[in-house]
């Protein structure tokens, strides 16, 4: 890979990259100096290379993959994934302008300065991964503010991880012809979720509080990823929020289980088991779907889980019956004691009366 760059007072600024792979990983150091920024239009196909690369320095590294293959500029639709080093602090304006195939972006919480229009035209971007090395603040809010589509965000803290979903949001003008009224119709809860940041820090309690709104406005697959993501990676998840996510899965188990079967998502079917959320109705719905799709592995797993569920249910019922029988037996014993006590008392009273009568005679 070849990288054109310029030296600045504090470090290196990336100008342009050339290579053969759609995944671009920027080094943290070039010629012994830290890489601290990426220039405007650095990954855009709209850069005037002849003008902007004048007097630029060249850094080159070979990994053996280029043999017999011609390098090309890594910009526009030729870029699908970019990994920035933890040293990078700034990206310039319109840096990804027109990168229509860019899907993943990885960086650290050092990246705080985001140039205007940085993500213009990045309609395929779907995932951000942020290495949180310094605290809880990041440049994610500014990035999300430029994109309307659903974005999955992974925050990687020192010892924990948070996997979040920021749903899509858009509005459209709808005309009511008879009334001659034009009004705006809003779709998706993404706009509200993007407001959960305060001073560049995500408020997880506010994020979880919005789930009720998401249930009313977003699609099943979005809600599944949100709820399972929070339950599996419960960073700053309160007990109340945890129960809200569990309750959503429990109430919609039939639809969710069918969706997971169609996605062949064994992992999340196992999560339902570990969270003890299965019901007979939900598991039968999943079994029916797996059977129709001839998913033998999934069917075997679900049949085993169903058997365990039936056994546990029967065990609970047996325990309840035993408790009832023990309770009834205790009641009968107590009743017998009371009757015996009453009989003894009556006998004593009768003797007392007879003594009184003899005394009177």
Tell where the protein language model's regions lie, with residue ranges:
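Structural signature of tandem-repeat unit edges
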Residues: 1-11, 18-36, 48-90, 100-113, ...
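Surface-exposed repetitive/solenoidal architectures
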Residues: 1-4, 14-19, 39-42, 237, ...
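C-terminal per-repeat helix/turn "cap" of leucine-rich repeat
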Residues: 42, 72, 94-95, 117-118
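Ankyrin repeat structural motif
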Residues: 93, 264-273, 295-304
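Long amphipathic alpha-helical scaffold regions
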Residues: 114-139, 284-313
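Ankyrin repeat domain, specifically the short helix-to-loop turn at the C-terminus of the second helix
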Residues: 239-243, 271-278, 300-309
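Ankyrin-repeat boundary/"N-cap" motif
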Residues: 247-262, 273, 280-291, 313-325
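Charge-dense, extended regions
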Residues: 288-361
């Amino acid at each position: 890979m070849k990288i054109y760059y310029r030296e600045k007072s504090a470090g290196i600024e990336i100008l342009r990259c050339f290579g053969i792979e759609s995944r671009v990983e920027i080094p943290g150091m070039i010629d012994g100096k830290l890489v601290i920024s990426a220039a405007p239009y650095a990954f855009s196909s709209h850069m005037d290379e002849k003008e902007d690369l004048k007097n630029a320095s060249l850094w080159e590294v070979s990994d053996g993959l280029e043999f017999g293959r011609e390098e090309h500029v890594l910009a526009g639709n030729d870029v699908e994934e970019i990994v920035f080093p933890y040293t990078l602090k700034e990206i310039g304006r319109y840096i990804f302008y027109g990168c229509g195939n860019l899907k993943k972006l990885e960086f650290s919480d050092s990246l705080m300065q985001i140039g205007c229009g940085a993500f213009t035209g990045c309609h395929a971007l779907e995932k951000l991964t942020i290495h949180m090395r310094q605290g809880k603040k990041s440049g994610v809010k500014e990035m999300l503010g430029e994109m309307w589509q659903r974005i999955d965000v992974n925050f990687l803290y020192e010892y924990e991880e948070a996997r979040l979903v920021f749903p899509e949001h858009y509005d459209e003008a709808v005309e009511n012809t008879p009334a001659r009224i034009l009004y705006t119709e809003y779709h998706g809860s993404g706009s509200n979720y993007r407001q959960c940041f305060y001073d560049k820090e995500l408020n997880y309690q506010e994020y979880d509080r919005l789930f009720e709104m998401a249930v009313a406005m977003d699609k099943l697959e979005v809600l599944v990823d949100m709820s399972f993501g929070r339950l599996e990676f419960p960073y700053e998840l309160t007990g109340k929020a945890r129960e809200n996510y569990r309750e959503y899965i429990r109430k919609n188990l039939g639809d969710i289980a069918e969706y997971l079967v169609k996605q062949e998502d064994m992992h999340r079917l196992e999560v339902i088991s570990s969270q003890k959320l299965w019901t007979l109705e939900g598991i039968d719905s999943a079994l029916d779907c797996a059977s129709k799709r001839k998913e033998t592995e999934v069917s075997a797993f679900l049949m085993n889980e169903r058997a365990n569920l039936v056994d546990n249910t029967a065990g609970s019922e047996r325990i309840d019956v035993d408790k009832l029988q023990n309770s009834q037996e205790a009641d009968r014993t107590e009743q017998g004691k009371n009757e015996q006590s009453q009989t003894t008392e009556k006998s004593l009273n009768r003797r007392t009366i007879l003594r009184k009568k003899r005394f009177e005679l």
